[in-house]
């Protein structure tokens, strides 16, 4: 259960991960670690003008953090650790501080970074987690607003307004505070992704289908409904390369059950309308000559997102290459359960409205 905004909790490491370094935990015992969730909800319910099955995304008009709308928190001039999960249906958050304070990014949804990464802002998709430290002793003011400027839907939707551009306020107490905590220069070094380990290369295409009036009615992965027979059957313990081809207008956070992966690069798709037309006809990236279209500009993965993750943002009109491990990343040990047992697993978009509209495919494993 997430701590309330005024509850003090001890610094703990994410479940399943060993301590961050032999030098000790990221923050010394006694420091504050406050798990947070950010979501957006309507203050007043509205009678839907469109059937929920065809509601592409839901955006509320109140930003809620740990059950409170636009809360505030009183902090001392010292380091605090926050674990933030984006629990919104569909809203992306691009977090930044109004007074210019930075974030020291130490981990994500699956693992620690190899080294702490200093960032002034960061983008968090639905279901993504950021593990970070904020040092309020660096503040040049007595308050700081955790702000958001991500359009909705992301990335080409409406700009934020006065209400949803603010997440919460930090009131920074005056006076010097003794802070003996240290942030290690090295956290955890996991095995580096090795393309030569990949036994299979897959192409996964994301589609959006619209009505005659241009309204989105359903979203498919690989042009198939969830009920269609399984087509992805990885071997337990294997490594694969997945090329995610996003043919929609939205950024889709992709989550793979039992898989941990590293985002390698994102390549722009040129002449995407022509490529999409071919893909919707035959749904075969090779036959549609994907290499002919995936030759635009490349987007480098941000330094704080180069580690192992279980969800990642798939940019629209780009092909994102990821290396997926279907095993533990810190060892070659197999799962302590039968991953081949029924009913199997899934991979899906983690925008809740897309997921509930079965932008999802079955995933079965074999030995």
What name fits each language-model region?
Residues 1-125, 129-135, 154, 163-212, ...:
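Histidine-centered copper-binding motifs that mark active-site loops
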Residues 82, 132, 146, 242-244, ...:
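A generic structural signal for residues embedded in beta-strands
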Residues 87-89, 136-139, 151-152, 246-249, ...:
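Short, charged beta-turn/beta-strand-edge "cap" motif at the junction between a beta-strand
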Residues 92-95, 128, 132-133, 140-152, ...:
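Ordered core of a single globular domain
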Residues 98-112, 247-302, 328, 353, ...:
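Active/binding-pocket-proximal capping segment
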Residues 99-103, 149-154, 174, 242, ...:
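Short edge-strand/loop segments of extracellular domains
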Residues 140-171, 341-342, 346-358:
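Terminal connector regions
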Residues 195, 201-263, 308-330, 334-348:
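C-terminal substrate/ligand-recognition segments
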């Amino acid at each position: 259960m997430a701590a309330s905004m005024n509850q003090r909790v001890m610094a703990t490491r994410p479940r399943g991960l060993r301590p961050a370094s032999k030098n000790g935990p990221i923050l010394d015992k006694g420091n504050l670690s406050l798990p947070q969730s950010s979501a957006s909800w309507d203050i007043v319910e509205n009678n839907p003008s469109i059937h929920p099955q065809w509601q592409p995304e839901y955006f509320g008009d109140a930003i809620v953090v740990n059950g409170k709308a636009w809360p505030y928190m009183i902090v001392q001039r010292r380091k605090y650790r926050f674990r933030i999960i984006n629990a919104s249906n569909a809203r992306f958050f691009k977090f930044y501080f109004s007074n210019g304070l930075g974030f020291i990014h130490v981990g994500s949804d699956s693992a620690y970074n190899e080294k702490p990464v200093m960032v002034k802002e960061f983008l968090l998709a639905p279901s993504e987690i950021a593990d970070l430290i904020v040092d309020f002793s660096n503040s040049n003011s007595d308050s700081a607003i955790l702000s958001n400027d991500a359009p909705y839907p992301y990335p080409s939707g409406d700009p934020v307004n006065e209400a949803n551009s603010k997440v919460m306020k930090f009131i920074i107490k005056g006076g010097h505070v003794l802070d003996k905590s240290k942030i290690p220069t090295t956290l955890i070094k996991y095995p580096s992704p090795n393309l030569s380990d990949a036994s299979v290369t897959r192409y996964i295409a994301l589609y959006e289908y619209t009505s005659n009036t241009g309204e989105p009615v359903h979203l498919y992965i690989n042009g198939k409904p969830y009920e269609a027979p399984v087509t992805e059957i990885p071997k337990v313990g294997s490594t694969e390369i997945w090329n995610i081809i996003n043919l929609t207008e939205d950024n889709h956070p992709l989550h793979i059950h039992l898989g941990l992966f590293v985002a390698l690069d994102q390549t722009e798709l040129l002449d995407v309308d022509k490529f999409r037309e071919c893909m919707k006809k035959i749904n075969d990236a090779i036959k549609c000559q994907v290499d002919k279209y995936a030759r635009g500009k490349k987007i480098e993965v941000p330094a704080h997102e180069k580690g192992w993750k279980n969800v990642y943002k798939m940019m629209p009109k780009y092909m994102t290459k990821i290396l997926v491990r279907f095993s533990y990343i810190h060892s070659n040990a197999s799962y302590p359960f039968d991953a081949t047992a029924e009913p199997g697993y899934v991979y899906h978009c983690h925008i809740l409205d897309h997921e509930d509209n079965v932008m999802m495919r079955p995933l079965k494993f074999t030995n």
